Amino acid sequence: MPGPLNGIKVVEFTEIIAGPLAGMLLADMGAEVIKIEPPWGDPWRLIQSFSQTESRPFLAYNRGKKSLTLDITTPQASDIIEKLILEADVVIANYRPDVAVKLGVDYTTLYKINPALIYCENTAFGRKGPDANRPGYDIIIQAMSGLMASEGKLSGESPEHISSSPMIDTTSGFCLAWTICGALFARERTGKGQMIETTLMGTALMLLGSRISQVESMDFFSRRDTVESLSAMRQAGVPFKDLIEIYQEEHPPTSGTMYYRAYQTKDNAIAIGCLSDPLRKRLLNILN
């Protein structure tokens, strides 16, 4: 049975995780996705590889696609790209903004070829600002956004990054696919394509959610004092480990955390998630 995106053509200028995951999700929904790779391949092919050109991570984010080897830095590539773009509905790119322009696969250039194109660009920090042309990986954005520190976990004396999965890259991939589907729906109504911008930093801030949202009447003074105090100690060279301990002493866990955590029991570890009063009462009854 054809998927909901059957007939949609996607050209993908991406590598590693966020962009490739978005393309894979669109392919899962029936789109024809053509991944453009340089002659040496997506770097992800070489991570945990089981052959000269394949790896588990690469397969995990690139199933269901067609692959085209093309050195887009050469003049000969421009004709091939133009033919692809003329027939494309969507382009996904995750280069730095300056790199996309240099390679001639930026929105302004491709719009001239196909004005109905939906162009989705994922960068680390966005197109404007002092960090616009800086590269960024999941771990860098974890650190800069505060996501890493918010976990309050240590690896020795340093903050421990979230390593079980590339959280920011993965969530960004879903955001890319989600916004592309929205743009395709808008084009059905208006006939117009558009440019979409997503960023790793924006994704990280979204994931932080209530940790960075502020209700002025409740949070302003308490958070201001905490931030000023911790900032002063950090500038004075207080180790991160000590900062975490100070923060946790001043902000003890709420009563709700006992109902949403893991416990070691006599025979095994268990995880409990009881966020509502009815569930908490049932848990208390079970525990007698």
Describe each PLM feature range.
Residues 1-189:
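N-terminal helix-loop segment corresponding to the beta1-alpha1 unit
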Residues 144, 148-288:
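Acidic, glycine-rich segments within the central catalytic cores of soluble metabolic enzymes
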